Every structure is written in C-alpha cells, then in structure tokens.
Amino acid sequence: MSVKPAGRAIPQKVENAVGAEIEWLVDRHDGAPNFEMRKFTIKSGGSIPKHYHPDIEHEQFVLKGRYKVGIGQKVYEVREGDSIYIPAGAPHWYENSNNEDAEFLCIVPKKEKYDSVYTEAESGLASS
C-alpha cells in the first residue's frame, strides 16, 4: 500500500513533445503489481507527436481542460470528465490549441520497458 502526498511526483518532460510533462503517480516503486498511473500535462500550445506502443494499451481520464487526441484515423475533441481507451499498437497523438493547460490520467500495464515508436520521420524511436 502506498499514499503519495500531492506534489511528490516530479514532473518530467515528455520525450519528443512540446510543452508536455509526465508525472509517475503510482508505479513499480510503490509496489503496484499490474498497472502504473501517470498524470500528463499539456500546456496551452503543446503537443505530443504521433506514436504507438506495440504492446501497451492506455486507459485515460481527462482531469482538466480541452484538447484534441488522434487515435488511428479519427480525431476527438476531449474535455474534463471524458474517458479514453487506446488499444495497444494504435497510433495516437495529442494537441492542445486552447488557452488553458490540459491534464489527464493515464493508466498502463506495468512493463519493464515502455517502447514508444514515433511515426513522424524526425522523431525516430524512443522509450518512455
């Protein structure tokens, strides 16, 4: 069991993104056996480029703001209170063109390594 006070997770820059941060709220260091929970912040004007994870699904919940998320060939405008499911292997991206920051929780299966394959030529291959 673990309880982390607010502000204890350290924000880190999201690789290959502009104006986006990730905080690992619950992870392997907390003893979580199956899943890990992260909080993403996408600043106004920020984006995370198109990428996919070969063997990682995402369950997300929008905490604050509005932003666009592309999943496969579809684009969705999401807002506070919306839930999102992204299957493993599905290309996805995020863009916040609004005047306020957006935040969402993202729960993923626990893995030794999180591979992110960026599909835009300049992005290459990265791990997150």
Predicted region positions:
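A short, N-terminal "cap"/entry segment at the start of jelly-roll beta-barrel domains
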Residues: 1-34, 117-128
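Anionic, Ser/Thr-rich low-complexity intrinsically disordered regions
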Residues: 17-20, 26, 37, 49, ...
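Conserved short histidine dyad/triad with adjacent acidic residue
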Residues: 23, 38-53, 88
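Short histidine-centered beta-strand/loop micro-motifs
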Residues: 26, 49-54, 95-97, 117
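A short hydrophobic beta-strand segment most commonly corresponding to one strand
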Residues: 39, 85, 100-116
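Short beta-strand His + acidic residue motifs that chelate non-heme Fe in jelly-roll/DSBH
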Residues: 50-51, 69-70, 86, 92-99
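Glycine- and acidic-residue-biased ligand/ion/polar-headgroup-sensing regions
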Residues: 55-67, 72
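Short acidic-glycine-tyrosine-enriched beta hairpin
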Residues: 73-88
